[in-house]
UniProtKB/Swiss-Prot annotation:
GTP binds at residues 402-409, 497-501, 565-568. Heterodimer of SrpRalpha and SrpRbeta. The lineage of its organism: Eukaryota, Metazoa, Ecdysozoa, Arthropoda, Hexapoda. Residues 149-160, 232-241 have a biased composition (Basic and acidic residues). It comes from Drosophila melanogaster. This is Signal recognition particle receptor subunit alpha homolog. The keyword Lipoprotein does not apply.
């Protein structure tokens, strides 16, 4: 039932393997190493799937070994965890720390461990189902606090109704003088006399004059409101022609964005303190107190200077602090938990140095993991790719997508300015046909960019053009026409602006998937805010899922890169960069850092990690 079992080092050297099917599983193992082990993803589950195959693996951090078993995904093998643990114990028992090159005779031990695991699994299946214990029941999971009655709850007021005792026969039946019954009788007689006494009737006019007149409801007048009478004063369409030129042009921006985008400038100061020594000491004392006192003076000195094997119990206090620290830096809670689980899996069973502390080991492992996550698997070089497309006689197309209000149009204009600075002429396709003012915003950017780079300096050719068809049209059709127009007029780059949409809006997500499928762009960039935390995970997962689900292509085009906006507003809370990159596995191409066209940077991995670890 196991197609392939292998033992290899984390460096990729195969020590021993058993191939029952005779097929090659090299690509599956390489994908496991690249996608899971090196990036420390899903190391807690110890499970990986590729096509019709599934891989169950176990890490040995003490010897830096990986034990992996490959089987068909449709088969469920419940004994694999125990089997891999027994195989690890058998391998360490036979060879220990000895390295024999490629000569590892482990076949007999493998068959023994496998047969024992299969027999134990078969017995477990045949065994009668036993009743679950009290500890496994739902009642045992109730906390003590939930069963304690709260005495501070407001006490309901109870009304006690008491029946009056019957009157005794010795008392007279008539009420005494001054009793409530006398008062009631006197009041009724007075009302009867008032009815019988004739009164002077007042005329209707007198009654009307005596009553004060009620004032009618006055209409509300808003302070900044307007009406049709103010339209003539506000109309500037006649004396302000469309070809108005900008009088105050910030010419200092021209020439500042030539070449490669500059890296993000984030303070990368050394951390003020590696970890609070007192808090670390308290955490370690708590762990030691749980383990109990043992050994006296010798064990005391061994704990100070001796090499120690780290366990999950030792790592837990430091990992909890690190998880809270990551969440405070705006990392999504789910991603922070996965990162800490990954660090725990990489350090469990590893030998500590003589004077190393657990906190320093955790911090070092987490820093390495963050650097790997932020380092791109592939480099997106827009200038190189745009020059390649220009040589092939076609425009280079970029589509911008994202939720509402994150700054898609603004950062599109920044990227457009950067491309103009590098001698590319650009066509902006206004495919946001939904939001009021979207086309006018792009038209304003187009005029401003042409004012910064006038046609007179570029052989009489406008460096930026706007292709728009108004509102309410099909965005995919407008983008197709814009790309065709760019091809006919030999425009170098087409930037497609799309409408902002929430990730749960199915009609708009179908429209975006159609736009990407029909036009087949060179690059799809997701524009997201650096302010978001948990929302970043939901946005990216659902955008990618929608682009894959609503496309009829066998290999749908999903998000290629990320533009992180409003990075200047978050100080050192840079966790959104980790969340977005971890979810998609795609690089952060641009970072928006301000309000001008020159406020566009490339991400600096080390600087971001240093800010995150402060």
């Amino acid at each position: 039932m196991l197609d392939f079992v292998v033992i290899f080092t984390k460096g990729g050297v195969v020590l021993w393997h058993s191939n029952a099917s005779g097929n090659s599983f090299a690509s599956c193992i390489n994908s496991l190493i690249r996608g899971v082990i090196l990036e420390e993803r899903n190391t807690e589950a110890k499970y990986y799937e590729e096509d019709h195959l599934a891989v169950q693996f176990k890490l040995d951090n003490e010897l830096d070994l990986v034990y992996a078993a490959i089987f068909q995904k449709v088969i469920k093998l419940n004994y694999l965890d125990g089997f891999l643990a027994d195989m690890q114990a058998a391998f360490k028992e036979k060879y220990g720390d000895i390295r024999l090159g490629d000569d590892y005779d482990f076949d007999r031990e493998y068959r023994r461990v496998l047969s024992a695991a299969e027999e134990a699994s078969a017995k477990q299946v045949k065994a009668p189902k036993t009743m679950r214990s009290y500890n496994e029941s739902q009642k045992s999971k109730k906390t003590v606090a939930s069963m304690i009655q709260d005495d501070k709850k407001p006490v309901e007021k109870r009304v006690n109704i008491q029946e009056a005792p019957p009157p005794s026969k010795s008392q007279p039946s008539s009420p005494p003088t001054g009793s409530p019954m006398d008062k009631i009788i006197m009041e009724k007689r007075r009302k009867l006399r008032e009815k019988l006494t004739p009164t002077k009737k007042t005329s209707p006019s007198d009654s009307k004059s005596s009553k004060p007149e009620k004032a009618g409801k006055k209409p509300r007048v808003w302070d900044l409101g307007g009406n049709s009478k103010d339209a003539a004063l506000l109309d500037r369409s006649r004396d302000s022609p469309d070809d108005v030129q900008y009088q105050n042009i910030n010419s200092e921006l021209v020439g500042t964005m030539q070449g490669v985008i500059r890296d993000l400038d984030v303070e990368s100061e050394d951390e003020a303190d590696n970890e609070d020594a007192s808090s670390e000491g308290e955490a370690e004392e708590q762990v030691q107190s749980k383990k109990g006192k043992r050994g006296g003076l010798l064990s005391y000195f061994k704990g100070i200077v001796g090499a120690k094997t780290m366990s999950l119990a030792d790592l837990q206090p430091a990992l909890e602090k690190m998880r809270d620290h990551l969440i405070s830096k705006n990392v999504a809670s789910e991603i922070a938990a996965k990162l800490c689980d990954s660090v725990a899996a990489s350090l469990d069973g590893k030998q500590m140095g003589t004077f190393d502390s657990i906190a320093s080991q955790v911090k070092e492992a987490l820093t390495e993991s963050l650097v790997r996550i932020l380092s791109p698997k592939r480099r997106i070089d827009i200038i190189r790719d745009a020059l390649e497309s220009k040589r092939n006689g076609r425009p280079y197309t970029i589509i911008f997508c994202g939720v509402n209000g994150v700054g898609k149009s603004t950062n599109l204009a920044k990227i457009c300015f950067w491309l103009i600075e590098n001698d590319f002429n650009v066509l902006i396709a206004a495919c946001d046909t939904f939001r009021a003012g979207a086309v006018e915003q792009l038209r304003t950017h187009t005029r401003h960019l042409n004012a910064l780079h006038p046609a007179a300096k570029h052989d009489g050719r406008n460096m930026v053009q706007l292709y728009e068809k108004g509102y309410g049209k099909d965005a995919a059709g407008i983008a197709m026409e814009a790309i065709k127009f760019a091809h006919d007029t030999r425009v170098d780059v087409v930037l497609v602006d799309t409408a902002g949409r929430m990730q749960d809006n199915e009609p708009l997500m179908r429209s975006l998937s159609k736009l990407i499928k029909v036009n087949n762009p060179d690059l799809v960039l997701f524009v997201g805010e650096a302010l978001v935390g948990n929302e970043a995970v939901d946005q990216l997962v659902k955008f990618n899922q929608s682009l894959a689900d609503y496309s009829s292509n066998e290999n749908p085009h999903i998000i290629d890169g990320i533009v992180l906006t409003k990075f200047d507003t978050i100080d050192d809370k840079v966790g959104a960069a980790i969340s977005m990159t971890y979810i998609t596995g795609q690089p952060i191409v641009f970072v928006g850092t301000g309000q001008t066209y020159a406020d566009l940077k490339a991400i600096n991995v080390n600087a971001v990690v240093n800010s995150l670890m402060k």
